[in-house]
Amino acid sequence: MQLRAGMLMFATLLGAIAAATLLASSPAAEGTMAEGTMAEWPMAEWSMAGVIALVAGITALVTQYWELRPGGSLFFVFAFGAVASMPTQPPIGEAVVTSIVVICWSLAMGMSSRLLGRRFWKPFGWPAGGVFRGDAAAVAYPLVALNVASAAVAGTAALLLSEPWGINHTYWAQLASVVPLAGHPTRLAVNRGLHRVIGTCGGLVIAALASLAHPPLWALILLIALFQGLTELVIVRSYVLGQLFVTPLALLSIELAMQGAGADVHAGALLYDRGLETVIGSAVGIVTVLLPWAVRKVSR
């Protein structure tokens, strides 16, 4: 299961680099883009929002079919959007090698419990073929449709509001919009959307304190590792508490990546975007969950 998750993430990362590169080099973008960056072409943001919506549907389908945990398209939408939104893309060879090394390291860490003794051993083996619980078509079609629709609507709303409200990270709204879709039943799905907003607000305070400290590079990396560990400790027990640490983890990771890409980092703008787009996306996701529920209630 871990290997399958790594394979899907690897494909997602390469897809993000390919999509950003293709948009930057497309004939429509030539002559309008400065230094080959995607952000200078107005239609690029709309195109990328559409691609991310498709990624949400495809990865939700694959995670359901392979029974990956945690389910849903959340992490893959985040990875795709974060990589594709970078002002410059790394050489493809460098990206491939780095991704493979990190995935192998993660797999090794996952199997490190074997060092504690035989009682922690679990036989190696390729997992059974993927399955859908229940009728395949009845599961697959609504799953893909809801994820694509939710991410598309959230992306559209964020883009339409980007100029008057000054927000610049559309994929954060799309990310928040798919969170409720991983919950079941409807009450749990709505709770996940609300919990994300509440937890994100608290996490923004922690992220602001971390950014105000202006940590050096080595300290920034340690903070990211710390928040990652804290997230893993609490996310299963409490989604709200998990968001307290996921939010600074995500923002500091973006800050680190932008520094590596040579871009200017405005911590205040990142905090503003994260908070506002989380509210937009969560609202869209909750409505997406409630609409089928309302239709079922009326049809009874």
Task: List the predicted regions and their residue ranges.
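Alpha-helical transmembrane segments and their membrane-interface boundaries
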Residues: 1-76, 80-244, 248, 253-300
